[in-house]
Amino acid sequence: MAKKSKALRAAIEKIDATKAYSVEEAVALAKETSFAKFDATVEVAYNLNIDVKKSDQQIRGAMVLPNGTGKTARVLVFAKGAKAEEATAAGADFVGSDELVAKINGGWLDFDVVIATPDMMAVVGRLGRVLGPRNLMPNPKTGTVTMDVTKAVGESKAGKVNYRADKAGNVHVPIGKVSFDTEKLVENFKALNTVIAAAKPAASKGAYITNLSVTTTMGPGVKVDSASF
């Protein structure tokens, strides 16, 4: 632990805490100050001036990053008949119905994304207590409740990320790995920022993005100037 603390202190010393960096500078600095011994995830953190208690100010959705996330998602699809065959052909890792419900209720969770056709939601609903807390419950807003399973599976495999504001208006989204070229991370970051900016509720007054930073797994946060996009 002492070694990690020393590494973190050294990383923090490279960052000017009083400065908001341009997106390019911030991403490069986040990569430079990453000290994890594995290919750390690069994550963007927003604090938004919204009141999530109001239904018209909730921020939630999904998008496909232009350069992916660096992680191949394990996709599970609840579907039957022709749609099950379509999901398998699209590259889904697991496809089924009640047998998957039983397996998941038994403790199996070796998947990253859950997709369902609308007619299967009554079956999937039985997994609410398991999937809900893990943000794995299929939802129309994120494109995971759909009849177009080919598109849903393809997007999930291509680097689709979900975003959702918590009770304090914070949104955390991974944009890639430290091993990515800085340019690719910046491109992902800018694509994400375009989506988040466009999601501003009409009822949100004043500054919308009140704080923005980029960080890596275990690494320090680097403040980003939202006007640099």
From Swiss-Prot:
Transmembrane regions: none
Keyword rRNA-binding among UniProt keywords: yes
Entry-linked Pfam families: Ribosomal_L1
Family annotation (CDD domains): Ribosomal_L1 (cd00403)
Any single Gene Ontology cellular-component annotation: large ribosomal subunit
GO molecular function, one term: tRNA binding
Keyword tRNA-binding tagged: yes
Function: Binds directly to 23S rRNA. The L1 stalk is quite mobile in the ribosome, and is involved in E site tRNA release. Protein L1 is also a translational repressor protein, it controls the translation of the L11 operon by binding to its mRNA.
Assembly: Part of the 50S ribosomal subunit.
NCBIfam families, per the entry: rplA_bact
Name of the protein in question: Large ribosomal subunit protein uL1
Organism for this UniProt entry: Lactococcus lactis subsp. cremoris (strain MG1363)
Lineage per the UniProt record: Bacteria, Bacillati, Bacillota, Bacilli, Lactobacillales
Gene: rplA
